[in-house]
């Protein structure tokens, strides 16, 4: 079980949004590299980064900030937001990313994801962002008619490293993870699932470590870490203890 601290990038700064709304952004750190190093120093082993401007623009926008993060931390980093082509993927992996997250392109062009998995084994994750059980695309600005499990099943056996499942209705508002839909997805596919959206307290960490949730690869935490609602040392100690 991995707890992924999140850095969301908007205009070169580390922010959190409420419900995926770019107008509701709180700046938590103007220096993303320093934030990445702080998470590493706290004992986290991975880092989850999203280029928010990129997700809306359909191309990487916060490249300089991502490079600063990669220079600042030794931890593996996964990045999503605006990565829509094989050339994009290759460029970012050459920059030192450990994993690239494909979201909109997974809906628009599933064949590209499958091809990427062949070219870059173990390096491709799929981001599934859902609102009301349906997949959202283009930085959450647009809804599709595609169901979450329906999309996930398209990549069964393709070699996807993980599915990052975000419940947009809970993102950034600290109401707790949508366990029902998250575990339903984890039960439906053999691809490892990472929960995102709504992690609110140490109770969510405890819930994550219960037997039925052990099938999850981990969870992503943003606002709860920044606001001090989850103490990194306590959370990481719980996870470590559960590993036995």
Swiss-Prot record:
Q: Which domain of life is it from?
A: Bacteria
UniProt record similarity statement: Belongs to the HisA/HisF family.
Task: Supply the gene name.
Answer: hisA
Q: Identify which top EC class this enzyme belongs to.
A: isomerase
Which terms in the GO cellular component ontology are assigned? cytoplasm
* Biological-process GO terms, alphabetical: L-histidine biosynthetic process; L-tryptophan biosynthetic process
Cite the InterPro entries for this sequence. Answer: Aldolase_TIM, His_biosynth, HisA_bact_arch, Isoase_HisA-like, Isoase_HisA-like_bact, RibuloseP-bd_barrel
The EC number of this protein is: 5.3.1.16
Keywords in UniProt for this one?
Amino-acid biosynthesis, Cytoplasm, Histidine biosynthesis, Isomerase
Protein name in the entry: 1-(5-phosphoribosyl)-5-[(5-phosphoribosylamino)methylideneamino] imidazole-4-carboxamide isomerase
Localization in the cell: Cytoplasm
User: What reaction is this protein's catalytic activity?
Assistant: 1-(5-phospho-beta-D-ribosyl)-5-[(5-phospho-beta-D-ribosylamino)methylideneamino]imidazole-4-carboxamide = 5-[(5-phospho-1-deoxy-D-ribulos-1-ylimino)methylamino]-1-(5-phospho-beta-D-ribosyl)imidazole-4-carboxamide
Active site: residue positions: 8 (proton acceptor), 129 (proton donor)
What would be one Pfam family of this protein? His_biosynth
Which pathway features in its UniProt record?
Amino-acid biosynthesis; L-histidine biosynthesis; L-histidine from 5-phospho-alpha-D-ribose 1-diphosphate: step 4/9
- Drop me one GO molecular function for this one: 1-(5-phosphoribosyl)-5-[(5-phosphoribosylamino)methylideneamino]imidazole-4-carboxamide isomerase activity
